[in-house]
Amino acid sequence: MKIAIISSVYEQTPPLRYGGIERVLDFLVKGLKTKGHDVTLFATGDSSSPCNLVHFFDHPVVPYEPNAQIIHSQKACRYINEHNFDIVHNNVDISVGLKDLLKVPMVHTLHMDVLSKSKQFIFSHFKDANYVAISDKQRQNAESYGLNVVSRIYNAIDVENYSPSLHRGKYLAYLGNFAPFKGPHIAIEISRKTGIPLKLAGKVNAMGKEYFEKEIEPYLDNSNIEYVGELNDVEKREFLKNSMGVLFPSTWDEPFGLVIIEAMACGVPVIGFPVGAVPEIIRHGENGFIAKDVNEMCSYTKQLSNIDAQTCHQYVVNNFNVERMANEYEAVFNKILNTKL
C-alpha cells in the first residue's frame, strides 16, 4: 500500500524529548515499512523517521500557532491528491475534515480526550469519519458521542530498546506533563506522606508554567523532591530503570498513557488511579497497582518490591510491540479499502 501519514507540526517526528503522538507515529512508520509498505510522512522538515518525508515547515512551530497545523494539513491534502496514494492516516484532530476533500479514504486516530468541548466542536461535524481509538475506554467515550469507531488499536513502543532493571532505586518517579489533571502535585503529596524520595521529569510548557510555579516549585528541595527536567529517550529509560516505581496519578480519562508501558518495559511497576485506560494496562498486583485514592497509593508503595521486573518487561513485549500495532493498522487500512471497493 501507498500510505500517507499526517503528523503534527509542533514537534519533530520522532521528538527529541516530549511528544508521545509523534513517537508512536515513528514506530508505526517503521512497522509499516518493515511490512513492505510505501510510507510518506507529513511532518516538520527536521523529522528523522525513516520514510519519504514531505514538509511545509522546516522546524516545529513554537510558540504554538493553531493556523500552522491547518496550513500543514491543507497542503498535505493537495499533495496527497496529486500523488496517487491508497489511504491516508491522519493524527491531527483539527484535520479530520480532510476526509471530504481527499480523493482516497482516510483513517483518523483519536489521541486525545474526545469529550472535551473543543474536540466535540470539531467531531460533531464529522461523526461518520473512520476513527481508531487507542483504548477501550476512549472507544466507549467516542461511540457515546456518536463517532464511527472502526477499531481499537493500543499504542506501542520499541521494546527491543528496553531491558528490565536488575537493581531498582530508592525513589518514586513521575514522568509527564505538568498540568493539574496529570497529577504531579499528587505525586508530591504521596512522597511527603510516605517519606519516599520523588524525582519528577517532564516538560513545563507555557500553559503549565503557572501551575508548576505554584504547585510544584515550592516543594522542590533537591533532596527528597527533585525536578530533573525534560529528558531524551536514553535519559528517560535510565530515569525509569533506576526508580523503585512510577506514579501515574492522572485524574482524567487518559486515552492511553505511554509512560505506563515505558516504565513496565524497564521492569518497573506503576501505580495509577482507575481512570481512562489505566485499568486496561495495569494488571493489579502483577505489574503495578490500581489505587482508589491517595491513601491507597501511599499504601501500595510498600508493595512495589513484590512486583517482578521480568514479568513487567515481558508483559509489554507480548502486548505492546510495534509489529502488533503495525499489523492491526494494516488490517484496518485493508478493511477500509475493501469496503470502498
What do the predicted segments below correspond to?
Residues 1-341:
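Catalytic cores of nucleotide-sugar-dependent glycosyltransferases that transfer UDP/GDP/TDP-activated
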